Amino acid sequence: MKIQKLLLAGAVATSFVAGGASAAEVTKIGLAVPNLSANYFIQIKESVEEYASKKGIKVITVNANDDSSTQVSQVQDLMTQNIDAFLYIPAGAAAATVPPRLARRAGIPVVNVDRNAETEPGDTFIAGEGVKSAYKVCSHIIDLAGGKGEMIMIHGQKGVTPEVNRTKGCNQAIAENPGVKLVADQWSERWSQDEGFSIAQNLLQAYPNVNLVFGQADGLAMGAAKAVAASGADHRIFVGGYDGDTGALKAIKQGVFDVTATQSTRAMGRLAVDSAIKLAAGGMVPKEQIIDAVLTTSANVDAFISDHP
């Protein structure tokens, strides 16, 4: 774990090797989040607010409750509140380009976190690496199943950056294992535990031989694990998740499901604030700042429970 923290610290530090802006040049930051029901977004929000507060910066946070039109209206309002920088996590793919455009018209730098729009990207994009990490999660559950079986994949919100990358990574793992067949995909709207339960319940009934489930977020995986427990299946079903939510880490320790990829959500929040400060001062930051997630099982989960990155 100490080695991993050093790697994370290095990844963050290398983004800021040239120059630096004073926090005194930024007094107010706007933060737009898709929802505050997902632990992943809660951790980013808390990290941004705590770190900004230490630098004397006020953060105005708006929660779209997963509604793109609501988020656009909220961002329009943020642009009237004299913010110095805008931290943006799109609520969906459909309207993801509008808020950055509004901010640029107002001369406000944009830091996209977790999700980016190809046609209207942020001035910098901060995210956890998704393809390689999803590949590792799916490879792990496939290995647990002996390289054979039927899989269902429960996706996040269709078309957003994490969903696209995690799908790609898991599909790569499936392609490398001819004994595994992906029998069903289904997309969620909110990446939630309730959706994970209902989707998995329906798919397990339709495909009773399934022995592999990949939920593209820990909420989906935990819901799927509950559906597995309720299914009465006479064979072992291995479940993988993604994100390293605090509740999910404890569930892995308890054996509720098998594996996740823990993201450095708190490091991402701090990096977003530092990037905003630098951009507002006219400094340069990389177009993309990507931090690796870490494969997490019962063997190493304790370290992440005690000190989430």
What are these regions (language model features)?
Residues 2-7, 11, 15-18, 23-309:
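A residue-level marker of the well-folded mature domains of exported/periplasmic proteins
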